[in-house]
Amino acid sequence: MSRPFALFNASRGSVAELGGQVLSRALRSTLASFHGCGESFRHLRSMNLLKSLAAVSSVTMISRILGFVRDTIMARIFGAGIASDAFVVAFKLPNLLRRIFAEGAFSQAFVPILAEYKAQQGEEAARTFFAYVAGLLTLVLAVVTLIGVLCAPWLVWATAPGFADNAERFELTSSLLRVTFPYILLISLSSLVGAVLNTWNRFAVPAFVPTLLNVSMIFFALFLTPYFDPPIMAMGWAVLVGGVLQLVYQLPQLKRIGMLVLPRLNLRDRGVWRVLKQMGPAILGVSVAQISLIINTVFASFLVAGSVSWMYYADRLMELPAGVLGVALGTILLPSLSKSHASQDVDAYSRLLDWGLRLCLMLALPCALALAVLAEPLIASLFQYGKFSASDAAMTERALVAYSVGLLGILMVKVLAPGFYARQDIRTPVRIAMFTLAMTQVMNVLFVLVLPLAHAGLALAVGLAACLNAGLLYWKLRARGFYVPQPGWLVFVLRLGLAVCLMVAVLLGLLQLMPAWDTGGMFERLLRLGGLVLAGVISYFGALALMGFRLRDFSRKAVL
């Protein structure tokens, strides 16, 4: 098990370096497009957005690469069957609650108000406010964690009812859930600390935190699985240890900015009630997205064994670009937009959104097409070893192609949704999310029960729903005048379109020259995959350069 890990790890540096060069070039080009736009752009530059985004994206890239190391090891050891399905469900449930309590509704309500306290009342008031909010969050999550541990079998039955037909799978999932559920408390407190650090422009430390979970899971998978019965239980404990590491790692940085305080309860505090008031609709909005994921798991639990795992591994691949760019942009834009709104700088607010949208389109469009075209090489190179069979690889490829449809929409939502949250308008995204949820279920029924798409139909429904969500958010921002596009969008999009067409043609041509992807060892497959990725990057950015895409062109107001 250690040898494939070493081979994969050896190639990690070149992949990260390549990704960093591509990202750096795109960031410089996009940000430079606003040079010379007057006082508003100088205000944007003062925020050090480029530096912050590059730092967060680079650290996130490392975390995602380690995540692939983790998933490759897990696929080799556990394959795609009863054990892996049980772990995916047991890990998904606390993650869903984490997104609701911490990274979702809570951060949407907490960050703008914390930024307001810091800007208008000073750091002492912000520190007291943080202590009160931390106390309330700790109490609520402790109760939720206790209920989750005690009610694990009922939670499994509610979220994966198809597992009830197999007693072994049901019991294993329940046991894993009891171990992983306390992760919700640890990671939510970690996310709270990260939100404070982001507000103080300490973006890199919270961005590095997910790496610790991956390190914990890799260590347990490689060295401790023989000591657990069944071996998959090692991964449950790895999640719990990872949660502890994620929280503890950030505390010294919190102390450094003078915000390390003991949680306190004060339900009479006006700021706490403002957060609770904002969290009401925010929880509903975030819950809509998580309910959609739960419903997808319910559908998948009735499909053939392995369906949950196939969707999981495909989703992990899609999460690489979504995490490196989407999470980084969302992390930086929310506090930046909140500050612009608090200072009533309408022009800077709109330009921040335009900057994010251009960057998303420039990087998400080629990534989405590359995921679809390179689905077979990606799955075979990263996962098709050991117990992960050729059939598992083929099923995962179908899910990845379906997921890739929604990558652009997912990334756009990461930019557009903060445009509402920063204005403390959570109701609009909630209404849109509820409509999107309803349409997702219509598509689930159509793609799974009417059309023979099985698990790929569930992935396709998620992707199309993300595009619908992004489209509606964009329409609302434009209709309310919160966002006014900068000049040059039409030519910008046309040139990107031509560049991605050339990239796809190059990739398809090279694929015809490659031997079968189920032959050769991991190192050989990764070398071939790296060659394809490099060819795609060169053809895409080379085409843009041939069409006049130059850094000096971004010194004008008209972009491209």
How should each PLM-predicted stretch be described?
Residues 41-560:
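Membrane-embedded alpha-helical bundles of multi-pass transporters/translocases
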